[in-house]
A protein has these predicted regions:
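Proline/Glycine/Serine-rich low-complexity intrinsically disordered segments
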Residues: 236, 261-264, 390, 422, ...
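Active-site His/acidic residue clusters
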Residues: 330, 374-419, 423, 446-457
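Histidine-centered active-site microenvironments of extracellular/periplasmic hydrolases
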Residues: 11-14, 434, 440-480
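Phosphate/adenylate-binding glycine loop and adjacent helical scaffold
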Residues: 505, 509-559
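A structural motif corresponding to the C-terminal end of an alpha-helix
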Residues: 315-316, 424-434
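Transmembrane and membrane-interface helices of multi-pass
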Residues: 1-181
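Active-site-proximal alpha/beta segments of enzymes that process anionic O-linked groups
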Residues: 156-401, 467, 494, 499-519
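A short beta-strand-to-alpha-helix junction
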Residues: 299-306, 407-417, 460-466, 478-501, ...
């Protein structure tokens, strides 16, 4: 009898060592809540494996406790991996730039990540978990939800977790010439200028479409003449590359009705900057004469006929380079020279008034003063043909007034810049000089954050950041454009600007009695919205944005 009692008391299996998830239940519940709200790029299988690691029975209690300590850094890394925050590669690659931020700006950035509503919701969830766990085995529900999420993943692509990610009906896009259809590399159909988007949005199909896009873009370029006609009229080209300005920013600042926008002759309403960082944006603009390339290829040598300003130099245009800053942060000036092909000397910045200080404490010069200096310098040029690249950043996040650490109000800075540019346009009109001005923002400033990124964060080139306002204005025309701007609302990018420049190279637009504006603006190259940084790619596919991080699976961009 004694022997029988002893045998039944001895453990026959490991069942008694299934201790549940304990406090890790709350960890997973928080994730489920964030996933439901659309704030996570959740990885079901990795989380299920992590839960299995936590649940695996371990007889020795000391080893069980040790497992929890080991799980802490793993859980933190997995949580970070499940968010949309920049990965280690991105942080390491930009570590030197972050080190250049002022302390006040770093504090400002950190405070933007604090969402008091979310903190309140998590607190309520904590209290609910503590209360319900007295009677309910929460671990059972957590494991069931994890299994369910993994079953959903097995049923289709990873983004099937969101209803918005379901395949839509076939959408056909049209290019600048709707009647033109060609085949891209690999036999993929291309309608007009853009690869057709007919396949369901699976990761494999989106990767294939992106490859077809780059293959098709590699074949496109603007055709510049070998020389100008004898009766060509000289004029000046001024390209203003403004940092941190998108349609979303203008709307958030309440400046959509600013008179500046009504003073352009041509306005691109659907222009993709293709990136959300300054260096790559400038390179893409300076290489506008060829189709869009991948982010990696931006830092590889390009064909000589890709460089817009070099093409103009070959036709007798004098190059000018000027900046509203010193160009040192992030090696911007170096990138412009090495990868953008702008080797001309930087226009003199001596005694320019400093109106702002950048997030790194560097000077930001007054745009009116810089533009007036350009007027003076180019007026003294012996060559009446010139092409100027002007990069300026008065709207950059973190800019502040001298003596004040707080970031200056975006709306006030944007209002000032728009007013100054409008006044400059008036002065140009009065001068009688023949000038083509092209205003092309680098990217938006992310004035409004979204579910993936807080305000000011641009690691992922979202549509609200890369959809930028581009305007073209001609001065000194015999027959200037009348009425509202001509709106180009087809998907466009830098190649359209290059082609537009080619169409007016002979300068006759300035002397003609009647300008055929429809002919000038019709059939410009269209470019599918593809935006890329070193660690993220965002595409528009079947009228929905999709994002891929660090070469992983495609998921719908949270709306």
């Amino acid at each position: 009898m004694t022997q029988f009692t002893q045998n039944t008391a001895m453990p026959s299996s490991l069942w008694q060592y299934w201790r549940g998830l304990s406090g890790w239940n709350f960890y997973f519940l928080v994730k489920f809540g964030l996933l439901w709200a659309g704030y996570l790029n959740f990885h079901p299988l990795l989380n299920l494996v992590f839960a299995a690691f936590l649940l695996m029975p371990i007889p020795r209690y000391s080893l069980h406790r040790l497992r929890h300590w080991i799980a802490l850094p793993i859980g933190f890394a997995l949580f970070w991996h499940d968010t949309w925050l920049p990965g280690p590669e991105s942080i390491m690659s930009q570590g030197s730039q972050v080190a250049g931020f002022s302390t006040d700006y770093l504090i400002d950035l950190v405070t933007r990540f604090i969402n008091w509503q979310m903190i309140g919701a998590i607190f309520v969830l904590l209290v609910a978990w503590l209360f319900l766990s007295q009677w309910i085995r929460i671990t059972v529900f957590v494991v069931a939800i994890l299994l369910w999420l993994n079953v959903l993943t097995l049923a289709g692509p990873s983004f099937s977790l969101w209803p918005a990610g379901q395949p839509t009906t076939t959408v056909t896009t049209t290019g600048g010439n709707a009647a033109t259809t060609v085949a891209a590399t690999g036999g993929a159909p291309v309608v007009g200028d853009m690869p057709a988007q007919t396949a369901p949005p699976t990761t494999a199909n989106l990767n294939a479409w992106l490859n077809n896009f780059y293959n098709a873009e590699a074949k496109r370029k603007s055709t510049f003449p070998s020389s100008l006609p004898a009766d060509a009229q000289p004029f000046e080209l001024l390209v203003i590359n403004i940092c941190s300005l998108s349609w979303s920013d203008i709307e958030a600042a309440g400046l959509m009705s600013h008179p500046l926008w009504s003073h352009f002759d041509i306005e691109f309403k659907n222009f993709n900057s293709a990136t959300s960082y300054s260096g790559p944006a400038a390179i893409r603009l300076l290489r506008a004469s060829c189709g869009q390339t991948s982010h990696t290829n931006l830092y590889q040598p390009a064909n000589n006929d890709c460089y817009l300003f070099d093409n103009l130099s070959k036709l007798g245009f004098t190059q000018h380079l000027m900046m509203g800053h010193n160009g040192q942060f992030g090696g911007f000036l170096k990138e412009v020279r090495e990868n953008g092909g702008m080797q001309t000397e930087l226009m003199d910045q001596t005694n320019l008034p400093v109106i702002l200080l950048g997030f790194d404490g560097s000077p930001v010069y007054d745009d009116t003063a810089v533009l007036n200096r350009w007027l003076d310098v180019t007026e003294k040029d012996k060559n009446s043909r010139s092409a100027t690249f002007y990069n300026t950043l008065p709207l950059h996040d973190g800019n502040h007034y001298p003596g004040v650490s707080k970031t200056a109000d975006y709306k006030a800075r944007a209002q000032k810049f728009f007013d100054e540019l409008d006044a400059f346009f008036t002065e140009l009109e009065k001068s009688g000089r023949k000038v083509m001005v092209v205003v092309v923002p680098e990217h938006g400033g992310a004035l409004k954050g979204d579910r993936m990124q807080v305000s000011g964060l641009r690691d992922i080139p979202s549509p609200s950041i890369t959809d930028v306002p581009v305007g073209v204005k001609f001065f000194g025309m015999k027959a200037p454009h009348q009425g509202a701007p001509i709106v180009i609302d087809q998907p466009s990018s830098f190649l359209a600007i290059s082609d537009l420049v080619v169409r007016v190279l002979d300068g006759k637009i300035f002397t003609e009695d009647n300008v055929d504006w429809k002919k000038l603006t019709s059939g410009l190259p269209q470019t599918a919205p593809v935006s890329e940084n070193s660690n993220a790619v965002v595409i528009q596919y079947q009228d929905k944005p999709y994002v891929r991080l660090n070469g992983g699976d495609w998921v719908p961009y949270p709306q």
